[in-house]
Regions:
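N-terminal export/targeting leaders of redox proteins
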Residues: 1-98, 141-146
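Extracytoplasmic electron-transfer domains, predominantly the class I c-type cytochrome c fold
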Residues: 93-159, 164-170, 174, 178, ...
């Protein structure tokens, strides 16, 4: 290659590097971390504020194949004293963490969302080609079904507690199981290995990949969650 071409290539690489570094410094999580460190300093003093980690944080759970970076912004998860704070600086309810520590379960296995992402919109998952958005009030409002955050989050409980007749603290799932029993759904459908064969097996219908559903009759969003809402 002659010198002009090499010069152009070099200039392009320099500009690309500058843009990359600039974009990296503009991530939202840097501001959230600075705000949390400031709040810790105001509440507990400068010495404790200096112990707040900086940079990207990640919880890696090999058994679940999950790498969650949620605590990059939600740094107060295990801190006492921020129970009344706004998200993402709010303490997580401790009674749940005692039986579901993040080191074992991660974050997205219960909450949903895109664990790899570190900016709010992609992390919370209301983006194209991501089928597991955060299960919360915003999602309920988007689908016009319910504005109770717990009602949606408890869907994740059934992944592990599928065979429990009742799950402590999961009132919505318990009610749904009782409703299926009272309405006699097993007369036509197999659920957890028992039931009729007139209709399809419903045991793992919620675990199917998004492309396995038929969306022809859906008028709104073409997602697996929308399919379940419609049915």
């Amino acid at each position: 290659l002659d010198r002009p071409v090499l010069a152009i290539i070099g200039l392009v690489l320099v500009v690309a590097t500058i843009l990359f570094l600039r974009n990296d410094r503009e991530h939202e999580w840097r501001w959230y971390q600075a705000q949390f460190k400031q709040q810790v300093g105001e509440k507990f003093g400068a010495d404790l504020a200096r112990t707040v980690p900086s940079g990207m944080q990640q919880i890696w759970v090999p058994s679940l194949g999950r790498a969650d970076r949620c605590t990059t912004c939600h740094q107060a998860t295990n801190w006492k004293g921020f129970e009344a704070a706004d998200n993402p600086w709010k303490t997580h309810p401790p009674e749940i963490l005692r039986t579901h520590p993040p080191e074992t379960y991660g974050c997205t296995s219960c909450h949903g969302g895109q664990g790899f992402a570190v900016d709010m919109e992609p992390a919370h998952g209301p983006v194209h080609f991501w089928e597991e958005p955060v299960l919360g009030k915003a999602m309920g409002e988007a689908y016009s079904i319910v504005d109770n955050k717990a009602a949606l989050m408890q869907m994740s409980c059934n992944v592990c507690h599928r065979y429990d007749r009742e799950t402590k603290g999961a009132d919505f799932i318990n009610h749904a199981k009782k409703l299926a029993q009272d309405k006699g759904c097993r007369a036509c459908h197999v659920i957890n290995g028992r039931g009729g064969t007139i209709g399809p097996d419903l045991t793992y219908v919620g675990d199917k990949a998004a492309e396995q559903y038929e969306y022809g009759r859906l008028s709104g969003q073409k997602t697996s969650f929308a399919w379940h809402v419609a049915h």
